[in-house]
Amino acid sequence: MLTLKVFVYTVVTFFISLFLFGFLSNDPGRNPGRKEEG
């Protein structure tokens, strides 16, 4: 059961980090007045 719990926590953390990364990377792109990396 411990392996299952670790697997679930890993998947959840992976999805959360992926969502946060996508949100942060898309945020400056939606603002035309602010360009960071082009």
Swiss-Prot record:
GO biological process terms, alphabetically, are: photosynthesis
Report the sequence similarity comment from the record.
Answer: Belongs to the PsbI family.
- Subunit description: PSII is composed of 1 copy each of membrane proteins PsbA, PsbB, PsbC, PsbD, PsbE, PsbF, PsbH, PsbI, PsbJ, PsbK, PsbL, PsbM, PsbT, PsbX, PsbY, PsbZ, Psb30/Ycf12, at least 3 peripheral proteins of the oxygen-evolving complex and a large number of cofactors. It forms dimeric complexes.
Note the Pfam families from the entry. PsbI (PF02532)
Name of this chain's protein:
Photosystem II reaction center protein I
Q: Which UniProt keywords apply?
A: Chloroplast, Membrane, Photosynthesis, Photosystem II, Plastid, Reaction center, Thylakoid, Transmembrane, Transmembrane helix
Q: Could you name the domain of life of the organism this protein comes from?
A: Eukaryota
